Regions:
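Charged/polar interaction segments and conserved charged motifs
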Residues: 1-5, 49, 112, 166-167
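Charged alpha-helical initiation segments
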Residues: 1-21
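Alpha-helical protein-protein interaction elements
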Residues: 6-10, 112, 140
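Amphipathic, well-ordered alpha-helical segments in soluble domains
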Residues: 6-9, 37, 91, 144, ...
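Flexible secondary-structure boundary motifs
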Residues: 24, 28, 32-135, 139
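C-terminal/domain-terminus segments
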Residues: 110-120, 154-167
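A hydrophobic membrane-anchoring alpha-helix module
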Residues: 133-163
Length: 167
């Protein structure tokens, strides 16, 4: 006795489910790297500018604490990308701790994840109580993270003066 395509939809498993699991795993790595780089930036910024507040002085952990530093110390108060990132991090946490379920342990839907499903119907899909990651989801999320980094860069980099060619 073994697995056959009569008792299990092997096509669905190998073309949708396994790729989704791989994408979920990649999302954990991507966000882990992003959190690490944001933390390194905050520590470096604090040293370079001898700030009164360090990253360790702030509550929270991971990306949330890094953003709190960027908001309070660096001064990026109105990030357009950060609200989107908070939804993606909710999804990441569900992937890491709850098998990518869109419901919490008390069976209540997680609003941020439901909003992502509504916002990206071609990239994320509901499979019962789980979220499936389709092709393109990670690239879309990477673009959101890139937008956030560009906001930080634009905020900390003074506008360049273009030299005048004529007096």
């Amino acid at each position: 006795m073994g697995i056959d395509d009569q008792s299990v939809n092997l096509d669905d498993i190998f073309k949708r489910y396994y790729p989704s699991i791989m994408r979920r795993s990649a999302l954990l790595t991507i966000i882990g790297l992003l959190e690490h780089e944001v933390e390194k930036f905050c520590i470096s910024y604090s040293k370079r500018h001898t700030t009164n507040i360090s990253l360790n002085d702030l509550k929270g952990m991971g990306f949330e604490r890094g953003h709190r530093f960027i908001k309070k110390v660096v001064g990026l108060r109105n990030s357009k990308a950060f609200p989107e990132i908070t939804k993606i991090i909710k999804l990441r946490n569900s992937c890491a701790h709850n098998d990518a379920r869109l419901v919490s342990n008390d069976n209540q839907e997680i609003p941020e994840i439901v909003r992502l499903l509504d916002q990206y119907p071609n990239l994320l899909e509901r499979d019962g109580n789980q979220v499936l990651f389709n092709e393109g989801a990670l690239v879309t999320f990477l673009n959101v993270f890139e937008d956030y980094i560009k906001e930080i860069e634009a905020h900390i980099s003074p506008p360049r003066q273009v030299p005048k060619l004529l007096p």
